[in-house]
Amino acid sequence: MKRKERRKQIMNFGQAIEALKGSKKVARKGWNGKGMFVYYVPAGHFKSYTEIGKSIADKDDLVHYNPYFAIKNVNDTVSTWVPSINDCLAEDWYVVD
């Protein structure tokens, strides 16, 4: 028995940004990597562990960061992500379930 594939609503980058802000994961049909997706990381903080981190930490030893986009890579690692011009102009974005 074949599994039914759910139809994905295709979006432009502006719509993808709105989905990201709404805590959704998004990806592009044009990406070759299986399982890759982008998600929004809200502002927060982490404990400083490096000398540079300690030099900018607050009195509680925390480094504060601004919101950013992250990408889950094919090898299951995560990196910060900045869209290319091709990503910005693409109209093949979809929400990942």
Residue ranges and their predicted role:
Residues 2-53, 57-59, 74:
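Catalytic phosphate/metal-binding cores of nucleic-acid and nucleotide-processing enzymes, i.e., regions
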Residues 21-22, 63-67:
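A short, compositionally biased
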Residues 48-49, 61, 91-94:
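Short, surface-exposed linear patches
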Residues 65-97:
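Short, compact, well-ordered microdomains
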